A protein has these predicted regions:
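Aromatic, loop-rich ligand-recognition surfaces of beta-strand-rich domains
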Residues: 797, 860-866, 874-1011
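Aromatic-lined substrate-binding rim segments of carbohydrate-active enzymes
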Residues: 291-357, 429-434, 439
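Carbohydrate-active catalytic/glycan-binding domains of CAZyme proteins
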Residues: 1-258, 303, 554-561, 577, ...
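Aromatic-lined ligand-binding clefts that engage carbohydrates, nucleic acids, or primary amines
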Residues: 40, 643-658, 687, 770-793, ...
Length: 1011
């Protein structure tokens, strides 16, 4: 029989005819064949029937198998046997997500239930089986999978007299199985409604929709031998129930529910093929008042989905203190997506990267100094579980299965670039799955590393950038999973250290190619927004703090304006609307200019210090329960009759050193600065070290990024030609928390001079008011200021730094008010002029640095004469990682890669990433690496400096300038002497592989190279 609605049925014919002329045949009318089950074999394209085959006296106890090309038959009978040499009575068959099939059957005179793995053709057992519920007399097994766990419904054996049903659960299909109890409720539940379990059928395309199917038979009323079908109910606490219903309608039972899953070569939305066109944007980076407009802009592009991260540290500022209000109202953001007919892909971490402070992890985790982040550390996993549950309490009811917009949820984030630990990733998966039952789960990574942590029961997606060779990026996945739907879950639209832009044509071409091939994508970012306050992260290796603007060169600018990229992308997406019209582009917010205004009040920092904490030893910010802002370390010095050397190990991130109030110098972590020449001083001289914490590193192993001074402060003096070092003790510590309340409660005074009595700029708070007649967006200009943080009307706007490249801060009009508005600047250096103005355009590209971006001094040339290479060779053309081994291990600290020629014969040389292999053939940590020299670096329009070869980002790269001929060379200081056995090289990911290196040499030395 067949049905399209489970109510109206069509007779299709006899699928397995009786064999009437052979009394010995299993299909002779004198024999018994019961509980037939049919499964489909994707590999053989056959439908396979398994059934319980019996003699009239029930002594045969065999399994029978038949096959057909169609579910309606006719089936060809293969034969019967006792699987694994054991009796086989009541039985069912089940196909797992990976295509493996299993038979469940009552054996040993119904005393024990067997689970037997089947061969790939599903026609016989492999010999691998388990015995379950030993001597518990279970029969009539019905098996289903829900939320990553296996469930078995079964009956007791009471001689054709209905009894209590039992539900059991297991993490592995072969067991161990744990009995939950009777799921049936209502009248006659203890008799399973006078029926016995036979099958549990999932209703595809209807969310968490399952039907429990029973055979009814009453010993004293055999005329009432019918089917009993009842829907399963799933509780939020994980319970499963089968309540009695006198009647129910499968056409309306799951009304409002939907389903999203991975089908063969495509995603399925309510059972139909669906291509995800996702716009990535992050609700904490957008003013709440503008959420709806930004979502509408994405909809008008032609997108159908919003992809978003959930930032743990934004929601849980202290352990157990959660905030899902205002700017953090995740549920409201998801509701707005649904109101705008947009689906949602939820990425709840716990780690997110996103150029966000500590990759989204909360700073207070570092109060436990030995914590292992992103590993199976008990405390870390405990806190992850608490956070993920809190998030789920907000939005788990908004999955598509519950009538909401959330179609997929991500497990962890790009873990392959962090490590290899399937156990940890599996734990995160289990936490996520428990919170979002029935939802499609996925994990994203790069084509070069996704297999490290790929879990078999998750969808795998790839991340790569504009210009990438798309077929090459998906080739490894297609080889392992030829039937998997393809998705680029982060198609990077822009990326850079200074404000970088990327050609729209590359982005459009990539999206067009993916859509033409039915490949789903998420454009990262479609709208970047702003890293308000102290939320901007930092990149690594080295230390490269991010700016406040997260404009990202995205189609929608930081302030919500449409860019040329937007209109070109909208035009491209118009071809892929499946007959629908693109939504109307919403009205844009016109920015305003605000006339120049002066700051009138100041609160000098050193006159407004909070109460000091006394400490014998140096400690980090986190040890003082401080997460953000600045920290002042103060101590008195012994008499120093001669100049000395001050060493700070290490200042995270920007330290200014004062002696009796006089500025001595700065220590900038970006430049690896740790030491200052220190003048002679009398006993009792006051040493002040003011350390500003910038964003914590958000990528790689360095995310365990403590702030303040992390180890020690030492003075080294030369006495009679011998160095003596003093580890300074007995500190007064002043915690300068980055909060509006801390700044506004300082003692302000009218601004007089901007220099102190020593002629130095004055660190502290500066306050002004400015008037607005009609509030709208603007960009406040801070070109004349030093370094610090800005608040407008109590809102944390972000960081400023005179070096640029960002000189303005985006001020949303929704945070301004008609009339007077307040602005407070906390400047740790002090301003040159106390003025600002509102511009109608941002200044994001004014980089004013004394240190050049390149790694070659004027007139400097690498001298390799007399040097012997440890390796001479050639790389292959094309994309992807390549490895070359040295003839023998070599030891050294300085490594030079000399590129001798290009694959295309042109001048350009490029390297996306490079690793060196240690004595065990493993990748050497690149954390301490420093570029000593590069003969050519293109930093004119994009930052393609040589340190891009170890920035952990496969989409960025070192590039020489186009007019500089071969050979090209780069020299790296490994930080210490290491044993090396080989090199790994990754060219650019574009299909034409611009700058691909052909012939090369590698040099390794213990001493620095000559220039």
């Amino acid at each position: 029989y067949s049905s399209k609605d489970l109510l109206n049925w069509k007779f299709e014919g006899i699928v397995l005819p009786a064999v009437k002329d052979d009394e010995k045949h299993d299909l002779h009318p004198s024999k018994v064949l019961e509980r037939p089950k049919v499964i489909y074999n994707e590999k053989t394209k056959k439908f396979v029937m398994w059934a319980h085959v019996e003699s009239a006296d029930y002594s045969k106890a065999c399994a029978g198998v038949a096959v057909s090309d169609s579910p309606t038959g006719t089936f060809t009978y293969v034969g019967s046997f006792r699987p694994n040499g054991a009796m086989s009575r009541d039985q069912t068959v089940f196909v797992d997500d990976n295509g493996k099939a299993y038979q469940f059957y009552s054996s040993e005179n119904n005393a024990t239930l067997y689970i037997s793995e089947l061969t790939d053709d599903y026609l016989k057992p492999t010999g691998r089986y388990t015995r379950n519920f030993v001597k518990q007399s279970r029969e009539a097994p019905a098996v289903f999978k829900y939320n990553g766990k296996y469930y078995m419904l079964s009956s007791g054996c009471t001689g054709w007299d209905p009894n209590v049903a039992e539900l059991a659960v297991a993490d592995s299909i072969m067991g161990q199985w744990t009995t939950i109890g009777n799921p049936c409720t209502g009248p006659d539940a203890d008799k399973t409604f006078y029926a016995q379990s036979t099958y549990v059928q999932q209703v595809y395309g209807k969310g968490n929709a399952y039907i429990a199917m029973f055979d009814r038979w009453k010993k004293k009323n055999l005329e009432d031998s019918r089917y009993v079908w009842l829907p399963l109910e799933f509780g939020k606490d994980g319970t499963i129930a089968i309540p009695w219903r006198d009647s129910w309608d499968p056409r309306t039972q799951w009304e409002g529910q939907g389903d999203f899953s991975a089908g063969k070569g495509t995603f399925l939305l309510n059972g139909k093929p669906f291509v995800i066109k996702a716009a990535e944007l992050h609700y904490p980076r957008i003013p709440k008042a503008y959420w709806d407009q930004r979502i509408k802009l994405c909809k008008a592009l032609g997108m159908n989905t919003i992809c978003l991260y959930v930032f743990w540290n934004s929601h849980e500022s202290q352990p157990g203190v959660f905030d899902f209000t205002g700017q953090n109202d995740l549920a409201e953001f998801c509701r707005l997506c649904q109101q705008n007919d947009m689906y949602v892909i939820l990425r709840p971490g716990p780690y997110v990267c996103a150029e966000w402070e500590m990759g989204g992890l909360p700073w207070w985790l570092l109060k436990k100094k030995d914590i292992r982040l992103r590993e199976s550390d008990p405390y870390f996993m405990e806190r992850v579980g608490i956070f993920e549950k809190a998030v789920a309490e907000q939005v788990a009811g908004m999955t598509i299965q519950n009538g909401g917009p959330i179609i997929m949820v991500q497990v962890e984030n790009e873990y392959g670039s962090y490590g290899e630990d399937k156990g940890y990733v599996s734990q995160i998966r289990d936490i996520v799955r428990a919170n979002y039952p029935g939802v499609a789960l996925f994990q994203c990574d790069w084509a070069s590393n996704f297999t490290k942590n790929g879990l078999h029961d998750l969808v795998w997606t790839m991340n790569f950038g504009t210009g990438a060779n798309i077929d090459q990026q998906f080739a490894p996945l297609k080889k392992l999973r030829p039937d998997s739907p393809l998705m680029c879950s982060e198609f990077w639209s822009g990326w850079g250290a200074n404000h970088e832009t990327r050609p729209a044509a590359d982005m459009i071409a990539g999206i067009d190619e993916m859509l033409s091939k039915g490949i789903s994508f998420s454009l990262y970012m479609t709208h970047g927004g702003t890293n308000w306050g102290h939320w901007a992260g930092a990149n690594s290796p080295g230390f490269a703090p991010d700016v406040t603007s997260y404009d990202y060169d995205a189609p929608i600018s930081e302030s919500g304006q449409t860019t040329p990229k937007y209109w070109e992308l909208r035009k491209a997406l118009s071809k892929y609307m499946n007959g629908e019209k693109q939504a109307k582009v919403p009205a844009l917010i016109k920015p305003i200019r605000i006339p120049s205004f002066q700051f009138t009040e100041m609160a000098p920092l050193f006159d407004n210090l909070p109460a000091a904490k006394k400490d014998r030893n140096i400690r980090t910010m986190e040890e003082y329960n401080q997460g953000f802002g600045s920290i002042l370390y103060r101590t008195t010095l012994p008499e120093m009759k001669t100049p000395s050397l001050l060493t700070v190990n290490d200042a995270h991130d920007y330290a200014q050193v004062f002696l009796d109030g006089k500025y001595i110098g700065k220590l900038d972590r970006r430049n690896g600065e740790k030491q200052l020449e220190f003048p002679a001083c009398p006993k009792g001289a006051r040493l002040d070290i003011l350390v500003e914490a910038m964003g914590r590193i958000n990528f790689g192993r360095a995310i365990k990024d403590f702030k303040g001074i992390t180890q020690s402060v030492e003075l080294t003096v030369d006495i009679d030609g011998r160095p003596f070092t003093c580890n300074l003790k007995d500190w007064e510590v002043y915690n300068l928390e980055d909060t509006y309340d801390f700044y506004k409660n300082m003692k302000f005074q009218p601004i007089g001079s901007l220099k102190d009595e020593l002629g130095q700029r004055i660190p502290g708070c500066y306050r002004a008011t400015f008037k607005v007649n009609k509030p709208s967006d603007t960009f406040l200009n801070f070109e004349t200021w030093g370094k610090g943080l800005v608040y407008v009307n109590g809102h944390a706007m972000g960081r400023i730094w005179e070096i640029g490249p960002q000189q303005t801060l985006y001020i949303p009009g929704c945070w301004l008010k008609k009339g007077e508005n307040e602005v407070i600047v906390f400047d740790i250096i002090g301003p040159k002029e106390v003025k600002s103005e509102g511009l109608s355009e941002p200044l994001l590209d004014q980089l004013l640095v004394t240190k050049p971006l390149t790694h070659r001094n004027e007139g400097e040339n690498l001298d390799l004469s007399g040097e012997q290479p440890v390796l001479s060779g050639s790389f292959n053309p094309g994309n992807g990682w390549q490895e070359r081994k040295f003839d023998q291990p070599v030891t050294g600290r300085y490594v030079c890669l000399e590129a001798l020629s290009a694959q295309d014969g042109k001048d350009l040389a490029c390297i996306a990433e490079m690793y060196l292999l240690d004595e065990n053939g493993e990748r050497l940590s690149r954390e301490p690496w420093i570029v000593n020299y590069a003969d050519s670096e293109d930093v004119s329009h994009v930052n393609c400096s040589a340190d891009k070869i170890f920035d952990l980002q496969e989409s960025t790269y070192w590039s020489t300038t186009k007019d500089t001929p071969y050979p090209h060379s780069v020299v790296i200081d490994l930080g210490s002497t290491r044993t090396l056995t080989g090199i790994q090289y990754l060219p650019r990911m574009e299909s034409e592989v611009p700058g691909g290196i052909k012939d090369f040499k590698v040099y390794v030395k213990s001493k620095a190279f000559n220039y």
